């Protein structure tokens, strides 16, 4: 969501804009590269990329590894086989953004945080019926103002307090059924979960991480437990849109510039 303009934009569009701005700077971008190890004391990164293994050192390092989706299926309350027309949020965005495909005309959305409302809005904008949304919670995880914002695009048919549920359909999803027999029919099930920080690299490198929440232990100014290490974006915890992460990173850049002086 691009909050400053009050509209929903595709991630590739926003990333394209950022890439054009970076192209006008001296920023070196290495794609197809993975950080496999960090040495916080030496500010050293071990990289694996098309050219093989290599090491980099820096005066300051920003961890912006984002977050991954923890779905209800991982928590054990959503049972059943993953048949055709069952997808996670990343599948929904891929079908819609990259391929222009509508995965379901009558979708059932499992989950109720901001990710679920964003997926519902994308489905509605692509031409689906109003989604059915179910969750274990009695009220949606997304806050009031977040839900109010998305009412411009979607007003899901909400059902809360679902303690256990299972997928319906042998070869393709035909809906979801609760343990007490309530059915929510549909031609596609979208499983949307909360985000947990991708802090494994920091944990393995010896930086301070709270368990079991995986939250980074931060000092004022988004500084991590080792001097010269900082964090930005969704790795900080919670769910934030791309524009929030952009502004958060821009504020941090000013602090790092001061740190390097």
Where are these regions (language model features)?
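FAD-binding core/adjacent interface of flavoenzyme oxidoreductases
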Residues: 11-12, 16-106, 175-179, 190, ...
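Residue-level detector of alpha-helix initiation sites
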Residues: 69, 113-115, 196, 236
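FAD-site-proximal beta/loop scaffold in flavoenzymes
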Residues: 86-96, 188, 192-239
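Short, charged, surface-exposed secondary-structure boundary motifs
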Residues: 89-90, 94-98, 140-147, 167-169, ...
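A conserved FAD-binding loop/helix module that cradles the flavin
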Residues: 232-260
């Amino acid at each position: 969501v691009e909050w400053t303009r009050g509209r929903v934009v595709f991630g590739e569009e926003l990333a394209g804009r950022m890439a054009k701005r970076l192209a006008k700077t001296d920023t070196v971008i290495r794609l197809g590269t993975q950080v496999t190890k960090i040495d916080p004391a030496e500010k050293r990164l071990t990289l694996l990329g098309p050219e093989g293994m290599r090491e980099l050192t820096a005066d300051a390092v920003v961890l912006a590894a984002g977050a991954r989706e923890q779905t209800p299926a991982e928590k054990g309350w959503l049972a059943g086989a993953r048949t055709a027309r069952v997808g996670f949020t990343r599948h929904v965005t891929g079908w819609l953004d990259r391929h222009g495909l509508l995965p379901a005309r009558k979708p059932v959305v499992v989950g109720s945080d901001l990710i679920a409302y964003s997926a519902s809005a994308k489905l509605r904008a692509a031409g689906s019926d109003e989604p059915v949304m179910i969750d274990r919670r009695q009220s949606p995880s997304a806050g009031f103002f977040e839900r109010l914002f998305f009412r411009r695009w979607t007003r899901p048919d909400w059902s809360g307090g679902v303690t256990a549920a299972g997928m319906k359909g042998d070869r393709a999803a035909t809906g979801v059924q609760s343990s007490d027999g309530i059915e929510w029919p549909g031609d596609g099930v979208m499983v949307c979960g909360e985000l947990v920080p991708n802090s494994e690299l920091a944990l393995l490198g010896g930086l301070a991480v709270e368990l079991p929440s995986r939250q980074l232990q931060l000092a004022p100014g988004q500084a991590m437990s080792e001097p010269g290490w900082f964090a930005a974006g969704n790795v900080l915890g919670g769910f934030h849109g791309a524009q929030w992460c952009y502004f958060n990173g821009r504020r941090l850049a000013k602090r790092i510039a001061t740190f390097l002086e």
